[in-house]
Amino acid sequence: MVSVTRSVFGDLPSGAGTVEKFQLQSDQLRVDIISWGCTITALEVKDRQGRASDVVLGFAELKEYLQKHPYFGAVVGRVANRIAKGTFTLDGKEYKLAINNGPNSLHGGVRGFDKVLWTPRVLSNGIEFSRVSPDGEEGYPGELKVWVTYTLDGGELVVNYRAQASQTTPVNLTNHSYFNLAGQGSPNIYDHEVTIEADAFLPVDETLIPTGEIAPVQGTAFDLRKPVELGKHLQEFHINGFDHNFCLKRSKEKQFCARVHHAGSGRVLEVYTTQPGIQFYTGNFLDGTLKGKTGAVYPKHSGFCLETQNWPNAVNQPHFPPVLLKPGEEYNHTTWFVFSVA
């Protein structure tokens, strides 16, 4: 049984609408999601003693989500991740996007899908959000109808993304939740044990755009096929953290891609997806300046993201998995976040 409770989270300035909160509860999980950016604001998971803690970074109030923040919990699009120099060419026409991350376009631009109000529809076991992204929004071609559905089933949070386009456009949707399985507000994620089921990753340039090479993980810091304790692993390889796409099988079938275990609490997160990639990000740009829920501060490496996705900058790399959605087709991807204790 899943209960869905609806409440007001806050009002947007200048009468631009009311943001609602939807609380989904199963016997194992409780998830709060708001209609601003389809954002997960809280996710309570029990530890091995049966004590529940909120394991996602975020804020208590709407005003904080309206200020600049690193996409805590939000759905990002029309194209998640980076597009080099904010440009791409389709059918001989060059499109110029908003530049909002160094020389590149990141997560859909200045006002991406994380910074808009979505229309909610309550389901028996979750919530569906929808919106229409108009032709030309943030420089992208064509009107795009989008649906994001969150459902609960026991210890599983399932996120489904669907989209239909009026003209050919790149589409790549993901959720940008930051997790800390010790509980949000814990100072770091160094004691988390991470596994990523990927034989290859994408090396990046200094602006975090993939170079185009598909590199084997074997013998590198990116070989996470067997569990590694994150803090020790970063030290051993002298790296600042991860912010890279790991290459999964291009099957479109549900596949296991990542597992994170926090030994102290016993909490385990496993991720399954139909997507061909997953961005593992270790909160390298968090700096402790943002004040989160319950007075928490979020310093560097205090949360991790597992963003299932198409490969970054795929629109400019013909040998990457196809990212273009054509009229008459449907974009349809699902990601499963499965929580348990061990």
UniProtKB/Swiss-Prot annotation:
- Could you tell me the keywords of this UniProt record? Carbohydrate metabolism, Cytoplasm, Isomerase, Phosphoprotein
Q: What Enzyme Commission number does this protein have?
A: 5.1.3.3
Q: Family, per the entry?
A: Belongs to the aldose epimerase family.
Organism listed in the record: Sus scrofa (Pig)
As its record notes, the protein acts as a catalyst of:
alpha-D-galactose = beta-D-galactose; alpha-D-glucose = beta-D-glucose
| CDD domains named in the record | galactose_mutarotase_like
* Positions of transmembrane segments: none
User: Which protein is depicted?
Assistant: Galactose mutarotase
Pathway(s) where this gene product acts:
Carbohydrate metabolism; hexose metabolism; Carbohydrate metabolism; galactose metabolism
**Biological role:** Mutarotase that catalyzes the interconversion of beta-D-galactose and alpha-D-galactose during galactose metabolism. Beta-D-galactose is metabolized in the liver into glucose 1-phosphate, the primary metabolic fuel, by the action of four enzymes that constitute the Leloir pathway: GALM, GALK1 (galactokinase), GALT (galactose-1-phosphate uridylyltransferase) and GALE (UDP-galactose-4'-epimerase). Involved in the maintenance of the equilibrium between the beta- and alpha-anomers of galactose, therefore ensuring a sufficient supply of the alpha-anomer for GALK1.
Instruction: Indicate the principal place this protein occupies in or around the cell.
Output: cytoplasm
**Which GO molecular function entries does the Swiss-Prot or TrEMBL record give?**
aldose 1-epimerase activity; carbohydrate binding
Q: Provide GO CC annotations from the record.
A: cytoplasm
Signal sequence span is none
